[in-house]
Structure formats: C-alpha cells, structure tokens
C-alpha cells in the first residue's frame, strides 16, 4: 500500500485505560513493520451538568457534575496488510471508543 495511512482516534472517560489501549495499538503496528506517529493527546472535552439539590424549591442550592472525555490520535504510516490484520484482531477494553479512517 503506497502513500496510505491509517488514522485512529481513541476516546475514553478514563485516561489510564486510554493510554494502555494506545500503547497496545502502537506496539502491534510497530511489530508488524509499519511506521507509527503518536499517540498524540488531543484536547480534553469537559461537560459540566448543573442540577438542583432539592426536589421542589431552594434554587440557590445546586450541585455540579462534570464528565471529561480524553482523546488520543494515532497515525500509522505505510501500513502493510499484516498491520491491518493484526489491528483487526486486537482486543481492547470496552470503555474505549475507536474511530478508524483509511
């Protein structure tokens, strides 16, 4: 495959699981003979939700919750068919969202 690259975007709420998954992908790609760029940390998305503490009144008493979405980007340059096959067989945790673009 000439002049091709595979771009992998990983998303997760837990950054430790995300980094472990990224290392697995990089290690698998390097073992199969492809050049790897990354993992590149992308900006963390932070969603803040404000909820009233009381059920009926007391609007001044509120509670805030936040959800952080961590993201990583991995580019696999010059992938071989062996690389693609190895990535398809890779077993990653269920808490990691993977987006692959060829």
Swiss-Prot record:
GO annotation, cellular component aspect: ribonucleoprotein complex; ribosome
Q: Which PROSITE patterns match?
A: RIBOSOMAL_S10
Provide the leader sequence positions. none
Q: Which SUPFAM superfamilies match?
A: Ribosomal protein S10 (SSF54999)
Keyword Ribosomal protein attributed: yes
InterPro entries membership? Ribosomal_uS10, Ribosomal_uS10_CS, Ribosomal_uS10_dom, Ribosomal_uS10_dom_sf
Write out the entry's keywords from A to Z. Answer: Ribonucleoprotein, Ribosomal protein
Q: Which SMART domains match?
A: Ribosomal_S10
A molecular function annotated in GO for this UniProt entry is: tRNA binding
Among the GO biological process terms of this entry, one is: translation
Subunit composition?
Part of the 30S ribosomal subunit.
Q: What does this protein do?
A: Involved in the binding of tRNA to the ribosomes.
Record PANTHER family: 30S RIBOSOMAL PROTEIN S10 FAMILY MEMBER
Q: Which family does it belong to?
A: Belongs to the universal ribosomal protein uS10 family.
Q: What is this protein called?
A: Small ribosomal subunit protein uS10
Organism whose genome encodes this protein: Oceanobacillus iheyensis (strain DSM 14371 / CIP 107618 / JCM 11309 / KCTC 3954 / HTE831)
Q: Print the organism lineage.
A: Bacteria, Bacillati, Bacillota, Bacilli, Bacillales
Encoding gene (name): rpsJ
């Amino acid at each position: 495959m000439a002049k091709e690259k595979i771009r992998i975007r990983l998303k997760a709420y837990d950054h430790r699981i995300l980094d472990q998954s990224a290392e697995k992908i990089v290690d698998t790609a390097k073992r199969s003979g492809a050049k790897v760029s990354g993992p590149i940390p992308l900006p963390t998305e932070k969603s803040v939700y404000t909820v009233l503490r009381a059920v009926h009144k007391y609007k001044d008493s509120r509670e805030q919750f936040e959800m952080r979405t961590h993201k990583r980007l991995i580019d696999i340059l010059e992938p071989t068919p062996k690389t693609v096959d190895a990535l398809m067989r890779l077993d990653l945790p269920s808490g990691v969202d993977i987006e692959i673009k060829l």
